Amino acid sequence: MNILIKNADIITCNASDDVLQGAFLGIKDGYIDFIDTKEDALKDFKADRIIDAKGKLVMPGLVNAHTHSGMTILRNFANDLALEDWLFGNVLPVEEKLTPEDIYWGTLLGIAEMIKSGTTTFADMYLHMEEVARAVSETGIRANLCRSPLKDSDKSVEDAVRCFEYFKKWDNSFNGRIKVYIEVHSVYLFDEPSLRMSAEVAKEINTGIHIHVQETLKECEDSNKKYGMSPAEICCKTGIFDVPVIAAHCVHLSDGDMGIIRDKGVNVIHNPTSNLKLGSGIAKVDDMLKNGINVALGTDGAASNNNLNMFEEMHLAALIHKGVHMDPTLIGASCALKMATVNGAKALGFGGEIGEISKGMKADLILIDMDKTHLCPVNDPVSAVVYSAQSSDVDTVIIDGNIVMENRELKTIDEEKVKFNVKEIAKRVLR
């Protein structure tokens, strides 16, 4: 379907940070065909749908670069705990009760929440990833999914085969909406041979790795006791960092760790809400950016956030570093927005395809209703998005050239059915 968006104010997130007013944007066969402020650009374009964006702001869809979407089932459960108590004492025991079908419904709820809050792409690491892929395929969202070749140490060969099969089935499927990486949960759950094997598998099938890195001080202390080196150092030693990497958190990096991550081209995912809620700390994002490290944003799971709202992550990322360092110039609005769009696209392996509004890019966009009291007057659109906008301001979402939400109505998800099923699942597993 060819879509024309007219009367559009557009934040492009391109290299020049262009912001256009009263522009026309054409979508053809899932790609951005043109962007122009002159009506002459329309003469050769035949639109199947015309969207009048007067009073709305068009911008790239947000990229949630680290989450566990099926954990919506555990939302508002086991709060106010340190990571180790939260994970080992509460979350893991409940997760043992979750069935593949449970994960399917939990993921659908997460996707519904993400689309309604302007997220068009996400990176997911969780259980029963076949069901996560099914939910992604049905809903039209874009995703980087990962699967481990070592789910069960007693069945490593069988799990490795299933990992290869998963990659073959889902990688680059659905018009390229799905990418598949290798899951390496963390250094504290994977021993050195497992880390090496995972790196070898990623190299063999030419893909990347999604891993948690140095989220807490305890993780760093335990790694130093066990290996005599930091998690970043052991990842470097075992080959984990020799492939494209999505490294979630990276809260406690020494200068040496940061040098490794910079030199290896590791993508860091900043999860400010989750890190604060679990008392993990605050990542040195400004130092990372000054070192040329690509930093994107993520929500983490709804069990530790407790939502999947990327507007909150942008807002918080733009505030906490100013306060901690007593420097209001750190992580400006434009920087926070780039972290949630183009940087996220690069981190997830979609760089050059999404994350900005430019001719030839895939049409992943959102329209924000700017006619709201809390946004008036707009003055600076980028600042308005980062500092004033709410997720509920997202009116329309387009992914891969398809309208998946319009006038806040989801087109690919039965929202009420999903909510009903997740409530029933939560009653069963949390009792």
Swiss-Prot record:
Which cofactors go with this protein? Zn(2+)
Note on cofactor? Binds 1 zinc ion per subunit.
> What EC numbers are recorded for this enzyme?
3.5.4.28, 3.5.4.31
| Catalytic activity line of the entry | S-adenosyl-L-homocysteine + H2O + H(+) = S-inosyl-L-homocysteine + NH4(+); S-methyl-5'-thioadenosine + H2O + H(+) = S-methyl-5'-thioinosine + NH4(+)
Q: Which Pfam families match?
A: Amidohydro_1
The record's comment on protein family reads:
Belongs to the metallo-dependent hydrolases superfamily. MTA/SAH deaminase family.
Q: What does this protein do?
A: Catalyzes the deamination of 5-methylthioadenosine and S-adenosyl-L-homocysteine into 5-methylthioinosine and S-inosyl-L-homocysteine, respectively. Is also able to deaminate adenosine.
Q: What protein is this chain from?
A: 5-methylthioadenosine/S-adenosylhomocysteine deaminase
Gene source species: Acetivibrio thermocellus (strain ATCC 27405 / DSM 1237 / JCM 9322 / NBRC 103400 / NCIMB 10682 / NRRL B-4536 / VPI 7372)
